[in-house]
Amino acid sequence: MKLAIDSGFPNSHAFVTLLKKEYGMLPKEYRREQKKEKQQTSQQLEQHNYIAGLKKYLNDNTHTHVVSPISKKQIDFSVNGSSYVLLHTWKKMMTVGRASDVLICDIQEMLTRFQNRIGFEYIKLCGIFSDDLHVYNEKANGTPVYSFTYIDKILDFVTKLHLNPWIQLSYMPEKLAKYPNKRLFGSNVSQPHSIAAWCRLVSEFLQHISNRYGLEVIRSWKFGLWNQPNTNMDLFGFSNEKDFFQFYKETFLCVKNFCPDIEFSLPPTYYIVSEGYENWYLNFLEWCKQNDCIPDSLSFTYYDTKLISNKNHSKESFGFIYAMSLSESPDGLKDFVMQVLRERRRLNLGKLPIYLSEWNNTPSQQDLLNDTCFKSCYIVKNILENYDRLESFTYQALTDLMADSSLPNMLFFGGLGLFTVNGIPKASYYAYTLLQQLGDQFLGRGDEYFITRENDSFQVMLYNYRHFNYLYANGERFDMTETDRYTVFADSEPVMISLCLSDIPQGNYKISETYVNRTHGSAFDQWVSMGALELTTPQEIDWLKKSSVPGFHQKIVSVNSDEILELDVTLELLEVRLIQITPLH
């Protein structure tokens, strides 16, 4: 009664009536709900109903046709400036998630298609010692039993695709684990109960693949250890930092004693993962210097997120929870790249290779923007802005079909992949097919454009990137729905670009434009236009695959004696467009 009167209600009955109307429950039930701990996991951001409740007060504009204003941009560029050869390091390495995923037939088909289209050099394979590959067992008397049959099948398949394995020595077979119940994503992530037993496993594995493929071949492969050791013990970290340092050193020596020429990388470090772990890899490298085990390369995991540990977690439990928010900055990856390059100089590591062995804007398998044109534009923007600055940019992941967690029973659930679970290419896949067509000579870049040359032809990549709003970055979907996912972009206007290229030799040219936007190349948007029903037959899936390809347009233009080529292009929100300019002889 006191709460009702203090809040301005005439009596408790009026208070209870309004509360039940607004929240659908009585005060006692409401208090019970409020006591439940609301936590966020790294797989899905919490949504706050009080924000969504404001939606009913918005004006209904469903019958109002809103014409988006068009911003204008002028690009003036001479193709006769200085140039240099591109390495295309974004094609250095790809990944499928866990090594065991390569055994899945559907994933093999997607992997084959992607590799045939792009031509990567390496594939990262993590979890090769996980129990699902049955690598390690023991007899009743404790004698170790090794089996590399499933690993052989994985390595045979990827090498037939002309992919060199990048082998991450992980995770821990349960029989070797100090903490048998310390599991994450289906694998044991404990430190070993015996480093000597672990090193025997590594040695047996190295000897096996050397016998099978030849030492000269595996010298061209790359090796690393573990995954994100700078996270808390409740994730991939060890109970004591020094325990991991020693684990690394003994594994490093084991590999180098077998073959000094094998490249052994820094354990993939989750960059600035959480409070208290920002300087982990700097401390680790200093320790390596003092202990003569400096890695041959650096390796990082990067997501445009901030992870904040839950201070109320139990140290006895391995179910550690992180709160997560997305970066509000559109330039997070660029800032990260420049920072690690500065730190490499400061540590006097020379030109020690830096591999981005896993990256995305989110680690979430249920972020609805993953299926949209946002992700294709995000990929293009970040690769072009950071082109060749690191030795690899390994996008996570190939497909939504990832075996480390259960998957929602729907087609577009916000998975990380370039392909849906049934092999439908998303807009993000086609971003890579456009990048693949860039030339080998870099001419220049600027505000949302990138220009290359290949022999007598020129390639111009344009994009209209917009970052999501503050609310979405902090977990509020607000008025986003399963089918309307672009409401989180405050600025949705198209941009009209006037492109003026000078010093183009006189003559006739074929202009070929390939573009990915909401009407071309986006399977999600095509699915929405089809009615957004679940696809129930192979024919429907095949139709969606064939109908959601990039747009394409060609025309012939003439360049006069002034050697100027002018083109006008309009890009929709989050559109990516490749313009190829080819002389006609």
Language model segments and positions:
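Non-catalytic accessory regions flanking glycosidase/transglycosidase catalytic cores in CAZymes
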Residues: 14, 33-168, 175, 179, ...
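Noncatalytic carbohydrate-binding groove/subsite architecture in carbohydrate-active enzymes
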Residues: 241-385, 389, 411
